[in-house]
Amino acid sequence: MSLVQGHGTSGLFTEPPNPINQQESSGPSLPAQDAAQAFASSPRAGATSTIVNPPKRKYKGAVVVQRATLSISAVLDNGQCVEIKYHSNLASALTNLCNTNLYDLPACLNRPITAHNLPALIEEAAAPYSLICYYQRGTVRRVEFQAEVPLLSFPLKFLVKQGKVFLIKDISQMQKCEFCGSFFKVTHTCALRRRDFYFHHVAAHSADWWEKISFTPIGAPPNTERLFIVYDVETYTWHGKFGKQLVPFMLVFQLLGDDHLVNVAKTLATEQNWEIWNGKEQDTLYYCITPEKRAIGVKFKKFRDTLQQHIAASLWSHVICQNPQLQEKATTLGLESPEELTPDQLKKFKLKGNPRFIEVYAVGHNITGFDEILLAAQVVSTRAEIPPVFEICRNFMPRAGRLLFNDITYSLPNPSYVPAKSYEHWEQGQVLASDLKSQYIKFMVRDTFSLTHTSLKNAAKAYSLTVSKGCCPYQAVNEFYMLGSYQQDADGFPDLKYWKDQEEYSFNKDLWIKEKKGAYDIIQQTLDYCALDVQVTAQLVNKLIESYQIFIKNSVNLPETSFNVFQRPTISSNSHAIFKQILYKAEKPNTHHLSTILMAPSNEMYEYVRLSIRGGRCYPTYIGVLQEPVFVYDICGMYASALTHPFPAGSPLNPYERALAIKAYEQKMLNHKTISYFDKDLLPGIFTIDADPPAEEFLDVLPPFCSRKGGRLCWTNEPLRGEIATSIDVITLHNRGWKVTLIPDTRTTVFPEWKCLAREYVQLNISAKEEADKSKNQTMRSIAKLLSNALYGSFATKLDNKKTVFSDQIESNIAKEIASGAYVVKSSSYIETDNLCAEIMPEFVVAYPPVNSDVRQLAPPSCSEEDPTKDPLAEAPFMHNFSMTSYHYKPIMFIDAEDDDFCLHTLEKSTPLIANNRYPSQIASFVLAWTRAFVSEWSQFLYENDAGTPLENRVLKSVYGDTDSLFTTMEGYKLMEEKGKKRLKKNGGKLVFDPSNPELTWLVECETQCEKCGSDAYSSESVYLAPKLYALKDTTCPKCHHVGKGKLRAKGHATSTLSYDVLKACYYADMQQGSDVFKTSRMSLRRTLTSVQAHVQPFTVTETTLTRKLRPWKDKTLHALDMHRLIPYSRKHPNPRNTETTWMELQWMT
């Protein structure tokens, strides 16, 4: 028994037994206050009492009294870190403060205090010093007040936080950890995870530097319906105000795909009076011929628009049949039909049924650089009669004179959509119907050239097609449409000058004679030629779909994937998708992105990483005619071999761990003359560096690094200042004798580990290529070679802040961004004006007299109607004989259309920073760094023995260096056979990096080989004029003494008119200051998509003649050692273009 105090004055009484307080430990217990109340009213001892069970509490848990004083840590507006302690109860705190200082609470402070009226109340209270601290997201903005006539003797300090006002008790100084953001007074210990989180998600300067890369499996829903419209056009030259413009006069197309979609398209083609080629409907080849300008585009647009409408109606009918309740929903909303629902309204309803996924492709060869541009002004419009219930998304992207994207998607909600929780099927490349939020109809433009990178003629051979491309006398067709006739031979066949050569002329004439079709019909022959091109392209489409599906199934080992190579527009985008799929399968991140395995630099970091991407070398070190043997060596699959090496992986280190990693590099460079690229103590990184070269006599003509400081990319032996370089380049420079200093830079990036991210991708492509060689499968060999070479380019993709939109695509969010200045309109282009209904007002001239102060009265406008005989000039206004001003009005076209129908805008972000969540650009930087390591090792084979000898006294060993090749003299050839034999492919060796035995892995082979015996051969004489402008006279075999043909390269010139002798004569004419001028001319097609130039019409292809002068290198980026030899710039021979000032801190002055 225990004694308890009663609430009255009666003293103590015994507490009766309370079974409630003796429950099991798992049951709730009464708090002390409730127990006291329960027994305060109970009878005293001896009295009969009844125990009443108290009501159960609604909430369980500990009851915590609110603290009287709270605190926050923040950074003041002057950068000082502080801790602010404040009272949680403003009213009582103010009262206590005033009472402590022997004041009553001022009436003004007794009113409700808010963040808005606080400044006025402070001025009314008139404290000698007052302070308001406005707190927001870790920072404090201070506003101070000082009363001229104080009414109080103590200061007032307030804190405004989340719209509430508090009284500050104390402000004390603090310190802030720069690595994890924690505040502390004396000492502090932070955790690794907190440091990483702060750096990547909290710190204002670095939180947006790295983005996770989204992932989508490479497959497509297995029940996807597809239709391919394979087409080709033929053009003639039309001379207009914009020059020689190419105008289509013929279009042929063939239909492939699912039968029901093909039948719909065939019915539409018949209804719209498309002619059937050769009268064979089963071939599904249709054509139209008309020389009328833009008529072909209008007819093809009508066909594509009508097809869109039919397929959209089919999909909507499918949805309505499965969801009849939509009619009732529409009626409830006051709509006549469910079609009038908006996409947002439809998303609110729960749909039922099976989704449909429909894809329609317009396919051709080289159409994104030619055909689609000619037709774009007619076919790019989205103004088809599509029900408004569809959500429309357009991806229109012109780039480098080509239509990279021209896709339209009409989507509806997918009733089967379920957010993915398990990603095992993603690892196998599968996309299920439940993975997609929308069912859709996609209309896409695809170019087989972008997937094969070769001409249609070569593609037919490379992919083993049963038909081949024909020949057409284009110029004869041009003259026929321009002049009405063309030159013919005695048999009425187009003259020899219209054909490529005598062989082509004879071959096609023989075919024509054998066909015995009578007189040569140039239009019919052109139609047959165009139809044959379409047939070849159609076979190529089927071959690509089938072959890539087999490649993904067997070589990539994804047997369940439904892969469609046309789902992505280019071979580069397909290679990148396959790479990500292989990486996703290997790493199993179990999410919708690649996690932290591989991240993309963004905003400020994107620019920093891009600065570390340095292109390949390409320059001659000898100018003129060289009359001694030259061998050409080429690195075998340079980018593919580089891609098998380790690359940076993981989320970049925070500044603390980064500093430790940098220290490891500095210690290694200080203590070791040579560092291994595969030292486990060194992590991958991108640094800002200074580098000083060794003494002049220890340099060579193959520098390990290049610089853009002079305005042009230049391989130089000069000191490097403030360059952005990878850790591989740091090691390369150090091993070549350069003194490298890592400069402190907040953007310096170090990654936590090395990984062979692309090794499996390259390995499977090499294996597929070798297997194809064994089985003589030319198609698989072509696919494997293309995919192997294309991956590097996808990593190096350069993004910009521009996008092209149509007026009808500018939605409210884009309009707000333009209004706020986030986007600016760089240019606007107008198209289709020739096809819209228009009323033209002819040219007219109006003469106006100058203002005359004597004219006071105007004649009534109807005076001539009242009296036709009265002279209207008898009264004012009338024309005097003094000088007048004439205004000439040009014809005015009034177009019956809205600007949204034909206005195209190019928008650009106002910020120079580029957001990137797609491409890991650091991989491209490291790929090039590995190739520089290859060439650095190569240079050691040739020049290691020359160390200490001045450059002018050395034997000539190499004369030209390209990205992946080197031209050596006989002396250089001997050194390769002796010191570089390990790297010669003919001696065996690996092309794929082996992680278990890490070493640089690359091979070279002699490109100049004897065409008879296959031995290494040389060119007995060669001439070098400039980068990418050289010629080898022949290929001489030292074994069998066979002399084969040479090699010529002249980038930008018409090589058909050049030869070794022409280049040689050009060099001698320039050296002897002769009067001969050497030029080359070739036809060039100028492609214009969007333009702000008045003399250029958007969406046109114009034909121009490009003439270039042939001459030796004038603006050299090397120093001339003598009349022929060139050497890189150095301290002794600095680059004259370098005008940039570099500020350095001299140690002896600090």
UniProtKB/Swiss-Prot annotation:
GO CC: one term? host cell nucleus
Q: What do we know about how this protein assembles, alone or with others? A: Heterodimer with the terminal protein; this heterodimer binds to bp 9 to 18 of the genome. Forms a complex with viral pTP, DBP and hosts NFIA and POU2F1/OCT1 for initiation of replication.
| Taxonomic superkingdom | Viruses
Ranges in a coiled coil: none
Subcellular location field: Host nucleus
Query: A GO BP term, please?
Result: viral DNA genome replication
Q: Which reaction does it catalyse?
A: DNA(n) + a 2'-deoxyribonucleoside 5'-triphosphate = DNA(n+1) + diphosphate
What the entry lists under HAMAP family is as follows: ADV_DPOL
Q: What family is it from?
A: Belongs to the DNA polymerase type-B family.
Its EC number(s)? 2.7.7.7
SMART domains, per the entry: POLBc
The name on file for this protein is DNA polymerase
Question: What molecular functions are annotated in GO for this chain?
Answer: 3'-5' exonuclease activity; DNA binding; DNA-directed DNA polymerase activity; nucleotide binding
Keyword set for this entry?
Answer: DNA replication, DNA-binding, DNA-directed DNA polymerase, Host nucleus, Nucleotidyltransferase, Transferase, Viral DNA replication
Other observations noted: This DNA polymerase requires a protein as a primer.
**Major site of localization recorded for this protein:** host cell
Q: Which residue stretches belong to region Disordered?
A: 1-53
